[in-house]
From Swiss-Prot:
It comes from Homo sapiens (Human). The keyword Heme does not apply. Keywords: Membrane, Transmembrane, Transmembrane helix. It comes from the Eukaryota. Testis specific. One of its GO terms (cellular component) is membrane. This is Testis-specific XK-related protein, Y-linked. It is found in: Membrane. It is a multi-pass membrane protein. Belongs to the XK family.
Length: 159
């Protein structure tokens, strides 16, 4: 037996997806001096489906994962978690790279943990994105030595 939702339950998520897509397009246009971005109808539908899947996948994971978690599988999940957590740091220490020397305002460990935690929170579903070696943190040109305190506090607040 199927349970049909009301019209409001079907329309509000659709409006939310369309609004989020238009906000993203506006942000891209604003960042690129209001360059013209034209979407065909099929691309807009594709973006709506993609955005809906982006919204639904964490909800489904959070709902079904604890329900299927058995105590016998807990040690396997912890091993996988710690491997994913420690592998980028092991690669970083094995490569011999170092943090830039122009991070004097705040401690280097704070910068490294802040970058790692923020990057992990954004890209936690993509293991290849977490590698600190691929970020080339030893390149001093990537990091300006000005405004470190403001950027650090802003990043910490957003995390």
């Amino acid at each position: 037996m199927f349970i049909f939702n009301s019209i409001a339950d079907d329309i509000f998520p659709l409006i939310s997806c369309v609004g989020a897509i238009h906000c993203n397009i506006l942000a891209i246009r604003t960042g690129n001096d209001f360059a013209a971005i034209k979407l065909q109808v099929i691309k807009l539908i594709y973006l709506m489906i993609w955005h809906s899947l982006v919204i639904i996948s964490p909800v489904v994971t959070l709902a079904f994962f604890p329900a299927s978690l058995k105590q016998g599988s807990l040690h396997f999940l912890l091993i996988i978690y710690f491997v994913l957590l420690l592998t980028p740091w092991l690669e970083f220490s094995k490569s011999g790279t170092h943090l830039p020397s122009n991070t004097k305002i705040i401690p280097a460990w704070w910068v490294s943990m802040d970058a790692y935690l923020n990057h992990a929170s954004i890209c936690c579903h993509q293991f290849s994105c977490l590698s600190a070696v691929k970020l080339q943190l030893s390149n001093e040109e990537l990091i300006r030595d000005t405004r470190w305190d403001i950027q650090s506090y802003t990043t910490d607040f957003s995390f």
